[in-house]
Amino acid sequence: MSTISTHVLDTALGKPAAGVGVRLEKQDGGGWIEVTHSKDTGSAWTEQVHDMSGQWVEVSRSATDGDGRCRDLAQDLPAGVYRIVFDTGSYLRNQRRASIYPEIAITFTCAGEAHYHLPLLLSDNSYTTYRGS
């Protein structure tokens, strides 16, 4: 089983983004399928990819604290495909700032027993994410 946490930093202001709505969703259905690719030269290869046709089901909902952290998203998650959805539109509107991103979704695969820390660096018109520790 795995755990998930996140940290949102407002890079335009140079400080943590407090009060950002966050929800964790799990893909229901889908699964791994084999896809075969071929080239004009006649060579081919097969790879395992995740079938993304399943429905998204909410697992939990929270908001970032004063330090921009969300520590209570989930504990003991089974393996699967998940996404964290950040309500960046509301956060920026509350500060009278405009953005082209009403929400930002980070989709990731959770496999085995591990901790997944997925920070979001946010500004009005850009964002970056990475797997933290």
Please identify what each model-predicted range represents.
Residues 2-111, 117-119:
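Beta-strand-dominated extracellular/periplasmic modules and repeats
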Residues 114-133:
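Compositionally biased low-complexity segments at domain edges in trafficked proteins
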